[in-house]
Amino acid sequence: MDEYAWLAWTPEHLSKRLQHLARPWCVVGGWALDLWHGQQTREHSDLEFTVRREDFPLFRQTLSELKFYTVKNGAFECLPEHDLPGDDIFQVWGFDTEANAWRVDVMLEAGSAQSWVYKRDTSIVYPRAEMIALSASGIPYLRPAATLLFKAKNTRPKDQGDFTRALPNLSGEDRQWLVDHLQRLHPQHEWIADLTH
């Protein structure tokens, strides 16, 4: 598979397809920040969203026009129609054979209907309602502080750009949340100084 063959759906396209599925999900990554901004601030090569691991079969059924491939350490494996991703799989890409392109990147999370769990440190748990917001058009997205925490681990130029654009608009609460968790997980991160000055 060509990992660069992306023609990603927009969050609006995804939301329309999932509108009748009563299970928690939310857009993450760069698109989550743009949903928070209320406008697209940069190009996006993919569309990432999270679902609870146990709910993946329902999402797969709803997005039945796609073929799904597990992704681990840069390797892609076709996920047979009725198989579940292994416990060591946290990412599944959806491929549109008609368009010959990837459409979505599905992140499998460990949370419950009520709780959000940070996958890189499962001791970080919050009520899901506190971590997920809705765009003006009703699309669920991960709140900006948590999105930026994910981006802090291996900060690429686009992640730095996302942070720079987000910083002036972060609420005091989001700034403090991000500072607290950066100090815990990435205590030398340069964003801490930006957030506290």
Regions found by a protein language model. Give the residues of each.
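Compositionally biased terminal segments of proteins
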Residues: 1-197
